[in-house]
């Protein structure tokens, strides 16, 4: 996964829908940056953090 991935790339990586990724961003579970009016990129570190088991 690239350092900053598209919403579709992130959804494919996590095995969820793009709507779920957008909800994760809105809830603060994933960090994303807006690079233009329609261009959003998700930070790889936040994806790794989301996938890290609790208590580790």
Curated annotation (Swiss-Prot):
Pfam family for this entry, one: HTH_17
Keyword Cytoplasm: no
Superkingdom of the organism of origin: Viruses
GO molecular function, one term: DNA binding
Assigned keywords, A-Z: DNA recombination, DNA-binding, Viral genome excision
A biological-process GO annotation: DNA recombination
Function according to Swiss-Prot or TrEMBL: Excisionase and integrase are necessary for the excision of prophage from the host genome by site-specific recombination at the att site.
Family membership noted in the UniProt record: Belongs to the L5likevirus excisionase protein family.
Descriptive protein name: Excisionase
């Amino acid at each position: 996964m690239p350092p900053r991935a598209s919403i579709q790339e992130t959804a494919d990586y996590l095995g969820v829908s793009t709507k779920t990724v957008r909800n994760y961003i809105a809830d603060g579970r994933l960090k994303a940056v807006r690079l233009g009016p329609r261009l959003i990129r998700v930070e790889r570190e936040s994806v790794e953090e989301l996938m890290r088991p609790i208590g580790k």
